[in-house]
Amino acid sequence: MTNQLRWLALYKKAIRNYIIKNGKPDLVHVHVPFKAGILGLWIKRNYKIPYLVTEHWGIYNNLIEDNYVSRGIAFKRYTKKIFQQASQFISVSDYLAKGVNRLVGKKEYEVIPNTVNTDLFFYKEKENSSLRFIHVSNMVPLKNAEGILRSFKKFIQQYGNVELIMIGDKGSVIRNYAKSLDFPIGALRFLGEIPYTQVAAEMQKADCLILFSDIENSPCVIGEALCCGLPVITTNIGGIPELVDQSNAIMIEPKDEESLTQAMHEMIEGINKYDRKKIAENAIGKFSYSVIGKQINVVYGEVLASLKQ
């Protein structure tokens, strides 16, 4: 509690100093209601400045352990109040917004997806001819990296010149499990945690992103892969169906390793049907900073206009 109070005091001081120096802003944009929304409430009460809120946090389900329902009374009370007093609610997916409305309370919303740095993630023609799958995540259990490894092991029993790149593991658990599967030399590489720029470079050298999660909201990694022109194999969960379609993805059910192996076969056998340049072009038109920025500016204008009525 002491740390929370210190955090609030520091931010309140910073906000006061900002207003003294620059004057009052017309609008405050809160990202993730708790804890930033507490400051939004304080600013609204003390300075009469309205705020809107964008929610990214995928806790409004019963699949993750640390979900909204499991949280304490204070968390729920403040979250509900933050949404109620917001002048507008933006969600990164329709799936997430419906979860908020189901558990927190009814609130009209706009869907604006997560953005992608298209200066890093863009189409680049592959320099190598070898076929390559790529997986990028923190590899916590809900990402089901072990299921990817088992499915890929079955896949390479029929295909030789195919590689799987795993990016983002923080420890030895997944690597040790991979060793137990006894992959052929050159079939599997772990790159660990690497700089963001290198993630983009590795995607540009790959042929397909694999995401086999048990639960997701609106994963940034899919937008990043699409902006590089990569088709995607992904589970049909959460907000993912809002990001992909048949022109750029194969969707399967979570935990279905047989379907994942089959999707790998389907992807490699039909890889030439995917127009990577068009995938990238469409994705940049959906996720780039400029596109998302324009959508947010429209919402700002609508909120400010409604307050003048």
PLM region spans:
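Membrane-proximal helix-turn-helix segments that form the acceptor-binding/catalytic region
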Residues: 45-46, 71-89
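Short alpha-helical donor nucleotide-sugar binding micro-motif in glycosyltransferases
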Residues: 83, 193-194, 201-206
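Carbohydrate-associated surface elements
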Residues: 95, 115
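Conserved donor-binding/catalytic core segment of Leloir-type glycosyltransferases
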Residues: 125-152, 165
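Nucleotide-activated donor-binding/catalytic signature segment of Leloir-type glycosyltransferases, i.e.
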Residues: 175-194
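Aromatic "clamp/platform" in nucleotide-sugar-dependent glycosyltransferases that forms part
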Residues: 214
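Short hydrophobic beta-strand element within catalytic cores of glycosyltransferases
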Residues: 231-234, 251
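Conserved acidic donor-binding segment of nucleotide-sugar-dependent glycosyltransferases
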Residues: 246, 250-257, 266-272
